[in-house]
Amino acid sequence: MLDLMIRGLRLEAPGILGLELVATDGSPLPTFEAGAHLDLHLPGGLVRPYSLCNAPGETHRYCLAVLLDPASRGGSRAVHEQLRVGQHLTTSAPRNLFPLVAESSRSLLFAGGIGITPILAMAQVLAARGDTFELHYCVRSRRLAAFIDWLEASTFAAHVHLHADDGPTPFDATALLRDAGDAHLYVCGPGGFMEHVLGCARTAGWDETRLHREYFAAPVQPAGDARAFEGRLARSGLTLQVPAERSVAQVLDDAGVCIPLACEQGICGTCLTRVLDGEPEHRDSFLTDAERARNDQFTPCCSRARSACLVLDL
């Protein structure tokens, strides 16, 4: 764990707060790769992952930007309302679930709204390497585009394309993805935006191995489709009943079984747990289709069981 201090807070766009974090003792911070995130331990015991958006070569600071979500479960609201300059925060070391491919002839970076944060770090790395890339930044309005002035003044401004709903340059994912070649696509943003972009890429013949994405929020699950099941913990010998209205993670916590949690939506993989027997009902946005098909792990923060019982490696 890292002990950091908030050195700066800045409103990057309406509803988007930028944070600059430094080591409390002034020492260099652990290095990170483009696409990485920190798990912030926030007031009230909340832990939430936020993407690093500064240049990965920087070791004197970490920069984040957090959108105040009207449907916040506490994380973004705590950041906006409770954090102050000079305050200390505990965080994880940087972790990367959305890495750049080491060698690619061309990269297409698609960001929707606050999805610009990991994409911003990627653009800085690609520019520093001299790689061929395009950054397409989609927002409802230019005034809502965090970092746009910085991007348009950057050394790679010619690679940046802003698509605002109220602007002159409409976003046409089909046209942009038509001639894929051997390019790699990186997309981050709201779920609907991401599914549209990925759907256009698949229709255009892109191979799944060249599609990279990171979700910031889980898809909404249909109401009333959850059912109760039994969870058996192989190592501790406990048998727990998981009611329809509660998650496995909540039931484990009630029983005093601690597992690591961060997003609590199935998007970060922090709580990934081995399944020894039974069939999970995967509701996460973290595992690949191939990983889901093996049914040997699941995310207890949101996923459930298709079988009457799951045996977990806990």
From Swiss-Prot:
Binding annotation for [2Fe-2S] cluster: 263, 268, 271, 302
Residues binding NAD(+): 105-217
SUPFAM superfamilies: 2Fe-2S ferredoxin-like (SSF54292), Ferredoxin reductase-like, C-terminal NADP-linked domain (SSF52343), Riboflavin synthase domain-like (SSF63380)
Keyword Secreted appears in the UniProt entry: no
Entry coiled-coil feature ranges: none
Involved pathway(s): Xenobiotic degradation; vanillyl-alcohol degradation
Keywords: 2Fe-2S, Aromatic hydrocarbons catabolism, Electron transport, Flavoprotein, FMN, Iron, Iron-sulfur, Lignin degradation, Metal-binding, NAD, Oxidoreductase, Transport
Record-annotated 2Fe-2S ferredoxin-type domain positions: 229-314
Domain FAD-binding FR-type: 1-101
Protein name per Swiss-Prot or TrEMBL: Vanillate O-demethylase oxidoreductase
Natural source organism: Pseudomonas sp. (strain ATCC 19151)
Lineage of the organism: Bacteria, Pseudomonadati, Pseudomonadota
